[in-house]
């Protein structure tokens, strides 16, 4: 495909007018470019298949530009000629000699002279794409837009209504009341031209007719169309009569004597066209009977684009024998008339001229009646004259009848046209009916779809209603809950208000109590001050009392002096004791009178009664007779007599109104009791609440008694199992000294540390065993013997002398079957260590008491070299085992990795 093209000078003869005319048809403006759509539309007229045309396009446009220049178009024409001549479609075939290409009727001079502007659509490709977008946006139905949908688009142009109406009439080419995609593009093109101040044509010019709406000429391989019903036979039969009448009228002036045989006239159908029409006839004559019917040529005739009335007239002209079928010459004549109308616009004649009659149907000319009449004039026979007159009469009648026939034929022709128009109307109505049925089907489909949507909406509505009911119920329940919560909240608020009021009341009471306490504290301070003053007075009284006692002692000494007076001395020589001590006693008494002197009574002074020597100095008179607090007692009332938190209404009363001490004066003293020695029963300071009350029995300390694990028999060092011998006291291990003797496990224990203290009541019975006897478990299997060390001969432990293991009291000897054994019960489990020593020798002989049986022989390891050899072997063996374990571990890791990789691989 990329091979270099052969120069045009070698491909196409210079100045070929046929190629120039073809190029002018596809590029009338000589732009030098032929678009793909124009080239494809033109090349399809060659009758070649799409595959061959695609190959021709690839060879003509090797660079893939999407269009053809003049040289490429010439190459395409040359390749079309190669394909039509039977040559291979390649670039090497361009140099071959071949006939020019044929593009249906374009090879005819008539088609060659046709205006090239008619083969191109004036709507450009980019405009068509834009108009197609607008067309799709209007939502066409079955590819058509109604006037209601197109009207808003046209009205947006602001053009006059008469111009828009003319645009609609011009664009609706098939007059179906709808616009398809191409017709809509024509309408939009006219609107844009009108907006550019171009006049709207009254008739749609051929360049604006879409390619799909253009009337095609009949060409080889095409499939034209013919009317469904052939013209009536009456009209078809009447056609030759016109010719006969015309011929009669035209030849009536001829003299019968001068009737001359006309020379043969050439047929109007050219020979080249006759050959081409014969090819079409052979393709159309499927039954090969030499005739084609109206159904067989219907599509060929309709493909020309002519009206059905005109095609019916052409059929009537061609069917000269009125057989309803066309022979080969008649078919060629009909195709000639169609070609003349399509290419030149020449209407077919009303009657066939002599040159139009097929050559095979040309016969002897019709004999002229006038010649017969003239010949009868020269006969001279009367009968012949009568016959001539009769013939003339008949001719006149015939003429009148022919006139009637022509009138009736004209009426029939009119009726036929009316019928044809009605048939056309019927066809249009049928097509409209089909469209309406299609619309009805669409409407029914839409109705069904809407019914389905309606059913879905009903289901959705029912669901929504159900949801609404559920939500309504939920809302009602929530409202009920809200109401209940509101009532609860209201009650709680009431409770809160009551609690607040109660709190306020309590706070007020607390404030009052605090005030009362403060007042009580103030009174208490006053009382304390008074008490302090009273205490000071008491102290002064005590000091005076001490002075009195000293005076008493002094008086006593004076009495002793009296007693020591000798008998010979006269009593008068001694001074009076009262007079002697009066001044001193007065000073000591602080101004006491003689009547108040406690030492005035001599009987009492010299009495030997000890009780009478110490009378109460305050017996005669109460020193605290006057109570300083008697007027206003601060403790007159009990401040805690009423509950301040009770529900009773609080009264503003004095919290200290009641005197707790009103019944008895705390400072009152009787004449017989000392105020400072007698204690009040209710004195809160008489006893210390934290001192130990000797009257209460003291608690017994559970740990105050003897140690539960102590032994009453442990009173001497000799009974201590660890007192005589340290089991680890020996610093040398050369002998068995200091080790427990396990050979005495079966012997009954001596009086151990627990035997005396616990006796038979300590652990003689298992505290955790059941009351019933438990069946004894089967005896445990003895442990396997310890393997002998890998060394030479050694002396067993059982053969050691007694000097090696001296006998000593065993602090760990087994507690045998003694009743005092806390760990062994005849009815319970046996001692787990009372069995055979696993380290003892296998000999059944009872070892002597001095032997140290039960220990492994550690001297059997041999000398140092043997021990080193044994250690080496053991280390090598351990190393081999370690390496074997490593190898096994590596193998297991490898197998695990392989298994994991297989598991991760996709199936």
UniProtKB/Swiss-Prot annotation:
Stated name of the protein: Epidermal growth factor receptor substrate 15-like 1
Lineage of producing organism: Eukaryota, Metazoa, Chordata, Craniata, Vertebrata
Regions annotated as coiled coil: 384-551
PANTHER family with a match to the protein in the record: EH DOMAIN (PTHR11216), EPIDERMAL GROWTH FACTOR RECEPTOR SUBSTRATE 15-LIKE 1 (PTHR11216:SF69)
Modified positions (N-acetylalanine) in chain numbering: 2
The keyword Lyase is assigned to this record: no
Keyword Repressor: no
Membrane topology label: Peripheral membrane protein
GO biological process, one term: synaptic vesicle endocytosis
Bias type Low complexity, positions: 241-255, 703-743, 840-853
UniProt subunit comment: Interacts with EPS15, AGFG1/HRB and AGFG2/HRBL. Associates with the clathrin-associated adapter protein complex 2 (AP-2). Interacts with FCHO1. Interacts with FCHO2. Interacts (via EH domains) with DAB2. Interacts with UBQLN1 (via ubiquitin-like domain). Interacts with CAVIN3 (via leucine-zipper domain). Interacts with REPS2.
Name of the gene this protein is made from: Eps15l1
Modified residues (Phosphotyrosine): 74, 562
Residues annotated as domain EF-hand: 48-83, 159-194, 272-307, 308-341
Composition bias, Basic and acidic residues: 622-636
């Amino acid at each position: 495909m990329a091979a270099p093209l052969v120069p045009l000078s070698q491909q196409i003869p210079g100045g070929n007018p046929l190629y120039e005319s073809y190029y002018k048809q596809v590029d009338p403006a000589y732009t030098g470019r032929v678009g793909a759509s124009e080239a494809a539309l033109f090349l399809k007229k060659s009758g070649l298949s799409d595959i061959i045309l695609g190959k021709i396009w690839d060879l003509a446009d090797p660079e893939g530009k999407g269009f053809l220049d003049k040289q490429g178009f010439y190459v395409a024409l040359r390749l079309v000629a190669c394909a039509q001549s039977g040559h291979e479609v390649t670039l090497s075939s361009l140099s071959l000699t071949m006939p020019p290409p044929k593009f249906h009727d374009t090879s005819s001079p008539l088609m060659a002279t046709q205006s090239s502007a008619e083969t191109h659509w004036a709507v450009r490709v980019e405009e068509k794409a834009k108009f197609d977008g607008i067309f799709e946006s209007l939502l066409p139905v079955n590819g058509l837009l109604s006037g209601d949908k197109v009207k808003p688009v046209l009205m947006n142009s602001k053009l006059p209504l008469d111009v828009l109406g003319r645009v609609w009439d011009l664009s609706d080419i098939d007059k179906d009341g709808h616009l398809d995609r191409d017709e809509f593009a024509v309408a939009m093109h006219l609107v844009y031209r009108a907006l550019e101040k171009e006049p709207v044509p009254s008739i749609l010019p051929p360049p604006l007719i879409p390619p799909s709406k253009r009337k095609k000429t009949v060409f080889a391989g095409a499939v034209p169309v013919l009317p469904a019903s052939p013209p009536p036979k009456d009209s078809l039969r009447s056609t030759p009569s016109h010719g006969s009448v015309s011929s009669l009228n035209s030849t009536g002036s001829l003299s019968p004597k001068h009737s001359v045989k006309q020379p043969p006239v050439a047929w109007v159908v050219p020979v080249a066209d006759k050959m081409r029409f014969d090819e079409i006839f052979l393709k159309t004559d499927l039954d090969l009977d030499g005739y084609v019917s109206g159904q067989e040529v219907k599509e060929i005739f309709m493909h020309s684009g002519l009206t059905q009335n005109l095609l019916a007239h052409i059929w009537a002209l061609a069917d000269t024998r009125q057989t309803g079928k066309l022979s080969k010459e008649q078919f060629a004549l009909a195709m000639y008339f169609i070609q003349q109308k399509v290419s030149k616009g020449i209407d077919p004649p009303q009657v066939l001229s002599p040159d139009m009659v097929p050559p095979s149907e040309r016969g002897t000319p019709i004999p002229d009646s006038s010649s017969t009449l003239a010949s009868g004039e020269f006969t001279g026979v009367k009968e012949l004259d009568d016959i001539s007159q009769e013939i003339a009469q008949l001719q006149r009648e015939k003429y009148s009848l022919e006139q009637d026939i022509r009138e009736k034929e004209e009426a029939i022709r009119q009726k036929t046209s009316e019928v044809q128009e009605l048939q056309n109307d019927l066809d249009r109505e049928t097509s409209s009916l089909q469209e309406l049925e299609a619309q009805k089907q669409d409407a029914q489909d839409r109705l069904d779809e809407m019914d389905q949507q309606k059913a879905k909406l009903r289901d959705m509505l029912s669901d929504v209603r159900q949801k609404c009911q559920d939500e309504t119920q939920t809302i009602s329940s929530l409202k009920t809950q809200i109401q209940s919560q509101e009532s609860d909240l209201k009650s709680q608020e009431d409770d809160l208000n009551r609690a607040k009021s109660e709190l306020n009341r309590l706070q007020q009471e607390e404030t009052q109590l605090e005030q009362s306490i403060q007042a009580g504290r103030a009174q208490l301070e006053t009382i304390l001050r008074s008490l302090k003053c009273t205490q000071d007075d008491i102290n002064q009284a005590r000091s005076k009392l001490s002075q009195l006692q000293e005076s008493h002692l002094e008086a006593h000494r004076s009495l002793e002096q009296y007693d020591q007076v000798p008998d010979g001395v006269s009593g008068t020589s001694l001074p009076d004791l009262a007079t002697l001590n009066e001044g001193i006693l007065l000073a000591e008494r602080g101004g006491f009178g003689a009547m108040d002197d406690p030492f005035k009574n001599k009987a009492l002074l010299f009495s030997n009664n000890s009780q009478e020597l110490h009378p109460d100095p305050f017996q005669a008179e109460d020193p605290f007779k006057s109570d300083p607090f008697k007027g206003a007692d601060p403790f007159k009332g009990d401040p805690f007599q009423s509950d301040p938190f009770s529900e009773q209404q609080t009264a503003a009363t004095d919290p200290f109104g009641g005197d707790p001490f009103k019944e008895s004066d705390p400072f009152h003293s009787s004449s017989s009791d000392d105020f400072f020695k007698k204690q009040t029963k209710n004195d809160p300071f008489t006893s210390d609440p934290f001192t130990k009350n000797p009257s209460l029995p003291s608690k017994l300390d559970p740990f105050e008694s003897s140690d539960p694990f102590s032994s009453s028999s442990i009173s001497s060092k000799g009974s201590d199992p660890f007192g005589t011998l340290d089991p680890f006291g020996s610093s040398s291990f050369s002998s068995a000294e200091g080790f427990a003797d396990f050979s005495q496990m079966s012997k009954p224990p001596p009086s151990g540390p627990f035997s005396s203290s616990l006796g038979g009541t300590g652990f003689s019975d298992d505290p955790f065993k059941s009351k019933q006897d438990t069946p004894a478990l089967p005896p445990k299997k003895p442990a396997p013997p310890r393997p002998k060390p890998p060394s030479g001969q050694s002396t067993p432990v059982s053969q050691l002398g007694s000097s090696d293991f001296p006998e000593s009291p065993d602090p760990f000897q087994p507690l045998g079957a003694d009743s005092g054994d806390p760990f062994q019960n005849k009815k319970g489990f046996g001692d787990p260590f009372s069995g055979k020593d696993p380290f003892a020798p296998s000999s059944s002989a009872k070892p002597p008491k001095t032997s140290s049986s039960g220990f492994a022989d550690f001297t059997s390891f041999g000398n140092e070299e043997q021990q080193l050899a044994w250690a080496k072997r053991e280390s090598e063996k351990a190393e081999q085992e370690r390496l074997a374990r490593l190898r096994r571990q590596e193998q297991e890791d490898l197998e695990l990795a392989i298994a994991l990789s297989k598991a991760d691989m996709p199936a």
